């Protein structure tokens, strides 16, 4: 927050996403209106639903910008819309559906694969330059790849996904992150295998 002037960067990122989606739909269709709603900040879900209803819209499709499964990234959104419909007296008069989580879609995974590829190239160039001028850093000479994500409490992660399934890492939230990490590494290995020489993850 400090690096962004005391505000969350997410609203500005959502405005940029909204503009990009509007442009893409204007160019390719379908020609449908797109609006933006927030759970915890203006514009609030209930206000946006009320306005959409007043403008004659009866079917709403929600895209939550959180890619992975979990209570706060999936079910809580559904609950928020359900509560808003009840509060506004619109239950049964307006339908709200939500797009599935997108952690495993090619475009999402590819962005991270491209980032890892570019990052490995840069780090390897920096390491080579330091070796060339005799200022090599301490260590074993291997590059450690670390995948990190939004932190959620273990109890919240454990609430992600159906019960009775033996998820890798203990929850669907952890398992899906591991699947994406492996898919990213597999893409780099397939297309630029030498970049993974002398790396650990």
What are these regions (language model features)?
Residues 1-201:
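Active-site-proximal alpha-helix that buttresses catalytic centers in soluble enzyme cores
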